Amino acid sequence: MWGLAGGRLFGIFSAPVLVAVVCCAQSVNDPGNMSFVKETVDKLLKGYDIRLRPDFGGPPVCVGMNIDIASIDMVSEVNMDYTLTMYFQQYWRDKRLAYSGIPLNLTLDNRVADQLWVPDTYFLNDKKSFVHGVTVKNRMIRLHPDGTVLYGLRITTTAACMMDLRRYPLDEQNCTLEIESYGYTTDDIEFYWRGGDKAVTGVERIELPQFSIVEHRLVSRNVVFATGAYPRLSLSFRLKRNIGYFILQTYMPSILITILSWVSFWINYDASAARVALGITTVLTMTTINTHLRETLPKIPYVKAIDMYLMGCFVFVFLALLEYAFVNYIFFGRGPQRQKKLAEKTAKAKNDRSKSESNRVDAHGNILLTSLEVHNEMNEVSGGIGDTRNSAISFDNSGIQYRKQSMPREGHGRFLGDRSLPHKKTHLRRRSSQLKIKIPDLTDVNAIDRWSRIVFPFTFSLFNLVYWLYYVN
């Protein structure tokens, strides 16, 4: 009962107020009363001195700021900056602009801003900024009856963002926007984020091709220079790079090219043209990928994560080419060279021995035999020739073979020849084995290729495991 009566009383007393507000609004919008608004604006601007800040000589002016981010257009690693388009709004109170008789806010033409005092705000890490001017200059001045001024701008700024690219492209970057007063110190002006943590909006709408915004932070502090202490506001973005683009454009091609270089291990080692062409092609392709990547990044003095990976892939590709060079050397180089050297050495020794022996005949009539003659005589001996009366084979400690002319008794000579025959055969076999040329085992090139088929994939897999565990975590 009492609630119903109270509601009626509230309606009775509030009705005149609503009627007055509506009448006031209608009177302002009425063309006949536009002269009153014009007189009010003229009165506010008459005698207004833009050279003096509000409450000059008194407490500092408190300037609140809001930012509505329209877009982040580009993040450049080459120039170490990013481009941001935003609606930048500043609020402060200027008692000289307070008015009465008009219960509405006055949104004035943007050119009025040139006749009013505005904060000397600038972006500390700005490289290039501009206020949009299509179709007119994108700025706004709105006056409130209590003298509060809203000054809004649509700005595109390119701000510096110093990046640490050691973990590129598995990195996270912090890019900031530093807002500061250029001339007024903290004795004259103070900055604050209007609305606290909600002072910046539009972050959730931003979509970047290579980054994801993990978080943003707002900071308010004072910085001290030689000319005094100045207020500073900071908007910081934490950007995490999306790895998908780099997997498709860099990592996967590098992995496939590295695997392609291992195909040469399955190609026959005497197919030089195929293996060399494959090795050189993969090396040049890796070089091209490295060159293209360096063109898209700044010239920095430290090694990046992607440099480590591409260098590792390049090493594997280059080692695959060197593996065939080693196989080629074993098959076509070292083996024949060793065989040729041994043959030349043996021939030279044989010629020297033949030449020296041909000129030597001792006093007893011993005749020097060559290895070939010894071999022929042994064939005769093994062939059943048992008559050793005319000749006998003997060896001295120097390994020189002699045929001694002698005429032993028939029975005694046959007995000596038969008894010494096994000993002579054994000794001749041992001496003739020393004359054989040791031909290298050329089948080891197949073993090199077989081991390469196992070692290269295993070490490359281990390299990938260590790389991704280190940089991802």
UniProtKB/Swiss-Prot annotation:
It is linked to Epilepsy, childhood absence 5: A subtype of idiopathic generalized epilepsy characterized by an onset at age 6-7 years, frequent absence seizures (several per day) and bilateral, synchronous, symmetric 3-Hz spike waves on EEG. Tonic-clonic seizures often develop in adolescence. Absence seizures may either remit or persist into adulthood. Histamine binds at residues 122, 181-182, 227. It catalyses: chloride(in) = chloride(out). It is a multi-pass membrane protein. It is found in: Postsynaptic cell membrane; Cell membrane; Cytoplasmic vesicle membrane. PANTHER family: NEUROTRANSMITTER GATED ION CHANNEL (PTHR18945). The gene is GABRB3. Beta subunit of the heteropentameric ligand-gated chloride channel gated by gamma-aminobutyric acid (GABA), a major inhibitory neurotransmitter in the brain. GABA-gated chloride channels, also named GABA(A) receptors (GABAAR), consist of five subunits arranged around a central pore and contain GABA active binding site(s) located at the alpha and beta subunit interface(s). GABAARs containing beta-3/GABRB3 subunit are found at both synaptic and extrasynaptic sites. Its main location: membrane. Glycans are attached at residues 33, 105, 174. This is Gamma-aminobutyric acid receptor subunit beta-3. It comes from the Eukaryota. Changing residue 293 to H: In DEE43; uncertain significance. Heteropentamer, formed by a combination of alpha (GABRA1-6), beta (GABRB1-3), gamma (GABRG1-3), delta (GABRD), epsilon (GABRE), rho (GABRR1-3), pi (GABRP) and theta (GABRQ) chains, each subunit exhibiting distinct physiological and pharmacological properties. Can form functional homopentamers (in vitro). Interacts with UBQLN1. May interact with KIF21B. Identified in a complex of 720 kDa composed of LHFPL4, NLGN2, GABRA1, GABRB2, GABRG2 and GABRB3. Interacts with LHFPL4. Interacts with GIT1; this interaction is required for synaptic GABRB3 surface stability and inhibitory synapse strength. SUPFAM superfamilies: Neurotransmitter-gated ion-channel transmembrane pore, Nicotinic receptor ligand binding domain-like. Disulfide bonds join 161-175. GO terms for cellular component: cell surface; chloride channel complex; cytoplasmic vesicle membrane; dendritic spine; GABA-A receptor complex; GABA-ergic synapse; plasma membrane; postsynaptic membrane. GO terms for biological process: cellular response to histamine; cellular response to zinc ion; cerebellum development; chloride transmembrane transport; circadian sleep/wake cycle, REM sleep; cochlea development; exploration behavior; gamma-aminobutyric acid signaling pathway. Residues 1-25 form the signal peptide. Potentiated by histamine. Pfam families: Neur_chan_LBD, Neur_chan_memb. Belongs to the ligand-gated ion channel (TC 1.A.9) family. Gamma-aminobutyric acid receptor (TC 1.A.9.5) subfamily. GABRB3 sub-subfamily. Changing residue 232 to Q: Found in patients with Dravet syndrome; uncertain significance. Keywords: Cell membrane, Chloride, Chloride channel, Cytoplasmic vesicle, Disease variant, Disulfide bond, Epilepsy, Glycoprotein, Ion channel, Ion transport, Ligand-gated ion channel, Membrane, Postsynaptic cell membrane, Receptor, Signal, Synapse, Transmembrane, Transmembrane helix, Transport. Residues 26-246, 293-304, 471-473 are extracellular. Benzamidine binds at residues 120-122, 180-182, 225. Changing residue 157 to M: In DEE43; uncertain significance.
